[in-house]
């Protein structure tokens, strides 16, 4: 038996039930996981399962693509060598509650308690790349029909218990709840509970629509950011228009995807590495970028074809009971390293302009985003949403070294928040599947939360799809998009953590410099593998 791990060019062999000496390194890796005192038994099981997936021979790809992946230009996000589940799944939970489930032997929900109980059950049957659901639903829309004569106090107590249950039984900060844009008791209660508990999980997005959402509700959401760096605030009209209505959700870290569908795979391109291989700006746009775009398309097609044609995933109960539709899944076309790409291309021209610091450099970045959007829109894929992939400014992973997530400005060199927004807002129109800029704000904003409210409204009015901020003194912060506690990172090496994303945060803090984000006073004018 041949085992390819983790690089497709590294081959080891099984001989009957015993292992040859060449497997000692692989065995040692398994043993390291099994004896790692920082991991719980469940976390060890998950990592060992990932190692097993990595031993499956990689699906057929061209030598050019294999070389691009080996060189770090293109990355498959460690999703496994033979995909058997989509990366992100967004079931229609409202439909589930209204019809019940034959597979789960559940009748339709009749009241609030039924609804919470049924959601608690189905969440354990929704797969994702992390094995924990990344989408828990637009919970106010899902739960409001079942409120009945519940008092505010009763709703608060039940939702608080529900929130604690989510963090303790599904401890992964990629798990995401959506609320808003309407004003209702579920939305306000979730904001209250989230601010009180300050949990890593679940992640939370508040949908904002200027024509629907009252200012005092947005103020409650931005006050929460001051207290616990949540929620993430999404520009509802822009997202809804991108999907022809309201059938979408925000999941994981800033991924906007079709409801009752999701993402079959996420592949990403390192723009820094692409720019390195270009002789000039013209060469970048005319030759190098289109070449790697075709390789990106090849990898998305290879991975999604295996999932849709060989894994049998879409024969399961989620599809059979109408909670997801195969046609509503699409590959995510991720990019990162925009800052480094722009700076490298300008250096090749002998220019000293820097991304995020002057209009000339920023304009080049916007041109790259526009070109990527045209390439993605003009290129059909085998299993896409209406035949297309979805462009996404990918938020980075814990293993990234010397490269900035998505189109963000480099850590530690950010200008004031207003300048930051002005530099990056023009990118947002191009990234249908989501984009993020994490602004780090000085703790003095806590004494002036109106400043956070005004900054948020200004960013959304400038065209931001999503607004996200960390407050410098908060223990609970965003890393690439998921939440971690700085106190957990500090003690992780010695004690481990109950929460699945703490190791990613610890690794990211060490490798990417995320904790070097520059806090700015608002009034100055704004992993995936075991190691």
Segments from the language model and where they lie:
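Conserved phosphate/anionic-ligand binding catalytic regions in large, soluble enzymes, centered on
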Residues: 325-341
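Conserved catalytic cores of very large enzyme subunits
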Residues: 5-9, 13-327, 348, 354-358, ...
């Amino acid at each position: 038996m041949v085992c390819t791990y983790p690089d497709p060019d590294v081959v080891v062999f099984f001989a009957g039930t015993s292992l040859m000496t060449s497997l000692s390194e692989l065995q040692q890796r398994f043993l390291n996981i099994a004896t790692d005192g920082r991991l719980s038994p469940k976390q060890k099981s998950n990592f060992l399962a990932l190692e097993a997936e990595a031993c499956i021979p990689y699906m057929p790809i061209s030598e050019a693509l294999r070389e691009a992946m080996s060189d770090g230009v293109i990355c498959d996000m460690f999703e496994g060598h033979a995909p058997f589940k989509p990366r992100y799944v967004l079931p229609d939970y409202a439909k589930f509650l209204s019809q019940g489930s034959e597979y789960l032997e559940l009748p339709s929900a009749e009241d609030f308690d039924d609804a919470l109980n049924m959601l608690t059950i189905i969440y354990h049957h929704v797969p994702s790349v992390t094995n924990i659901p990344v989408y828990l639903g637009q919970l106010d829309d899902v739960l409001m029909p079942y409120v009945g004569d519940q008092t505010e106090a009763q709703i608060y107590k039940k939702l608080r218990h529900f929130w604690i249950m989510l963090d303790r039984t599904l401890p992964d900060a990629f798990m995401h709840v959506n609320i808003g844009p309407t004003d209702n008791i579920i939305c306000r209660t979730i904001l209250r509970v989230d601010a009180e508990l300050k949990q890593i999980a679940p992640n939370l997005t508040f949908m904002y629509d200027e024509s629907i959402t009252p200012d005092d509700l947005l103020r409650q959401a931005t006050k929460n950011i001051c207290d616990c760096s949540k929620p993430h605030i999404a520009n509802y009209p822009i997202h809804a228009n991108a999907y022809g209505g309201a059938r979408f959700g925000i999941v994981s870290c800033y991924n906007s995807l079709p409801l009752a569908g999701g993402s079959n795979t996420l592949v990403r391109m390192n723009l820094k590495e692409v720019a390195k291989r270009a002789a000039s700006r013209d060469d970048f746009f005319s030759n190098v970028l289109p070449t790697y775009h075709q390789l990106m398309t090849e990898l998305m097609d290879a991975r999604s074809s295996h999932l849709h044609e060989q894994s049998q995933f879409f024969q399961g109960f989620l599809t059979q009971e109408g909670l997801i539709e195969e046609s509503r899944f699409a590959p995510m076309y991720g990019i990162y390293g925009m800052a480094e790409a722009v700076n490298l291309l300008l250096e090749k021209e002998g220019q000293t302009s820097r991304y995020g610091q002057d209009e000339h450099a920023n304009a080049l970045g916007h041109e790259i985003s526009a070109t990527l959007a045209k390439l993605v829109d003009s290129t059909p894929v085998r299993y896409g949403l209406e035949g297309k992939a979805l462009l996404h400014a990918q938020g980075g992973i814990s293993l990234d070294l010397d490269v900035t997530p998505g189109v963000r400005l480099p850590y530690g060199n950010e200008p004031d928040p207003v300048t930051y927004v002005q530099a990056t807002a023009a990118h947002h129109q191009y990234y249908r599947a989501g984009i993020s800029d994490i602004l780090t704000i000085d703790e003095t904003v806590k004494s002036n939360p109106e400043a956070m409210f005004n900054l948020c409204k200004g960013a959304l009015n400038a065209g931001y799809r999503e607004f996200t901020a960390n407050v410098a003194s908060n223990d609970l912060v965003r890393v690439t998009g998921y939440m971690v506690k700085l106190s957990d990172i500090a003690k992780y090496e010695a004690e481990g953590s109950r929460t699945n994303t703490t190791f990613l945060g610890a690794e990211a803090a060490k490798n990417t410099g995320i904790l070097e984000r520059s806090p700015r006073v608002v009034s100055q004018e704004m992993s995936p593998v075991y190691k």
